[in-house]
Protein backbone atom coordinates (compact mmCIF):
# COMPACT_ATOMS: atom_id res chain seq x y z
CA UNK A 1 0.00 0.00 0.00
CA UNK A 2 1.00 3.59 -0.65
CA UNK A 3 0.20 6.96 0.96
CA UNK A 4 0.78 10.04 -1.23
CA UNK A 5 0.76 13.49 0.37
CA UNK A 6 0.29 16.48 -1.97
CA UNK A 7 1.54 19.60 -0.18
CA UNK A 8 3.08 23.07 -0.64
CA UNK A 9 5.37 25.24 1.47
CA UNK A 10 2.84 28.11 1.55
CA UNK A 11 0.08 25.80 2.89
CA UNK A 12 -0.09 26.09 6.69
CA UNK A 13 -2.13 22.91 7.22
CA UNK A 14 0.29 21.04 4.93
CA UNK A 15 3.28 22.13 6.98
CA UNK A 16 1.57 21.10 10.24
CA UNK A 17 0.73 17.71 8.74
CA UNK A 18 4.25 16.86 7.53
CA UNK A 19 5.68 15.91 10.97
CA UNK A 20 2.61 13.75 11.65
CA UNK A 21 3.00 11.93 8.34
CA UNK A 22 6.71 11.45 9.05
CA UNK A 23 5.80 9.76 12.36
CA UNK A 24 3.35 7.50 10.51
CA UNK A 25 5.98 6.70 7.89
CA UNK A 26 8.33 5.58 10.65
CA UNK A 27 5.63 3.58 12.46
CA UNK A 28 4.49 1.75 9.31
CA UNK A 29 7.83 1.71 7.47
CA UNK A 30 7.80 -2.03 6.81
CA UNK A 31 4.15 -2.08 5.72
CA UNK A 32 3.29 1.12 3.81
CA UNK A 33 5.20 3.30 1.33
CA UNK A 34 4.87 7.05 2.03
CA UNK A 35 5.48 9.60 -0.73
CA UNK A 36 5.41 13.41 -0.67
CA UNK A 37 4.62 15.52 -3.73
CA UNK A 38 5.41 19.25 -3.71
CA UNK A 39 2.43 20.70 -5.60
CA UNK A 40 4.39 23.77 -6.74
CA UNK A 41 7.15 21.68 -8.31
CA UNK A 42 4.97 18.87 -9.72
CA UNK A 43 2.08 20.75 -11.34
CA UNK A 44 1.60 18.16 -14.08
CA UNK A 45 1.28 15.39 -11.51
CA UNK A 46 -1.28 17.48 -9.61
CA UNK A 47 -3.34 17.80 -12.78
CA UNK A 48 -3.13 14.03 -13.35
CA UNK A 49 -4.36 13.40 -9.79
CA UNK A 50 -6.98 16.17 -10.04
CA UNK A 51 -5.66 18.02 -6.99
CA UNK A 52 -7.94 20.99 -6.19
CA UNK A 53 -7.04 21.62 -2.53
CA UNK A 54 -4.06 21.15 -0.25
CA UNK A 55 -3.25 19.10 1.65
CA UNK A 56 -4.66 16.15 -0.28
CA UNK A 57 -3.63 12.67 0.77
CA UNK A 58 -4.21 9.52 -1.29
CA UNK A 59 -4.35 6.14 0.44
CA UNK A 60 -3.81 3.45 -2.19
CA UNK A 61 -4.44 -0.15 -1.12
CA UNK A 62 -2.86 -3.14 -2.83
CA UNK A 63 -6.33 -4.15 -4.00
CA UNK A 64 -9.32 -1.84 -4.26
CA UNK A 65 -9.94 1.81 -4.97
CA UNK A 66 -7.83 4.67 -3.62
CA UNK A 67 -9.20 6.73 -0.75
CA UNK A 68 -8.73 10.50 -1.01
CA UNK A 69 -8.77 12.80 2.03
CA UNK A 70 -8.54 16.58 1.97
CA UNK A 71 -7.78 18.29 5.26
CA UNK A 72 -8.56 15.34 7.56
CA UNK A 73 -6.88 14.89 10.92
CA UNK A 74 -3.83 12.68 11.54
CA UNK A 75 -6.08 10.44 13.65
CA UNK A 76 -8.32 9.89 10.63
CA UNK A 77 -5.26 9.04 8.53
CA UNK A 78 -4.14 6.40 11.05
CA UNK A 79 -7.65 4.94 11.01
CA UNK A 80 -7.58 4.67 7.20
CA UNK A 81 -4.10 3.12 7.23
CA UNK A 82 -5.04 0.54 9.86
CA UNK A 83 -8.55 -0.35 8.64
CA UNK A 84 -8.31 0.11 4.88
CA UNK A 85 -4.67 -0.38 3.90
CA UNK A 86 -3.56 -2.91 6.51
CA UNK A 87 -7.00 -4.40 7.25
CA UNK A 88 -6.39 -4.57 11.03
Region annotations inferred by a language model:
Residues 11-14:
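Hydrophobic heptad-repeat coiled-coil signature
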Residues 1-9:
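Short active-site neighborhood of thiol/selenol oxidoreductases, capturing the structured segment around
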Residues 1-2, 28, 76:
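Preference for well-ordered, secondary-structure-rich cores of eukaryotic proteins
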Residues 48-52:
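A short glycine-leucine-enriched loop at secondary-structure breakpoints
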Residues 6, 18-25, 29-43:
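Thiol-based oxidoreductase modules, predominantly thioredoxin-like and allied folds used
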Residues 43-44, 75:
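Acidic phosphotransfer microenvironment of two-component signaling modules
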Residues 53, 58-88:
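Non-catalytic, surface beta->alpha helical segment in thiol-disulfide oxidoreductase systems
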Amino acid sequence: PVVIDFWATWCGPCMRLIPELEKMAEKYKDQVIFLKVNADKEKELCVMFNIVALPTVFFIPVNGKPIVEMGATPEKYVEIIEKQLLKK
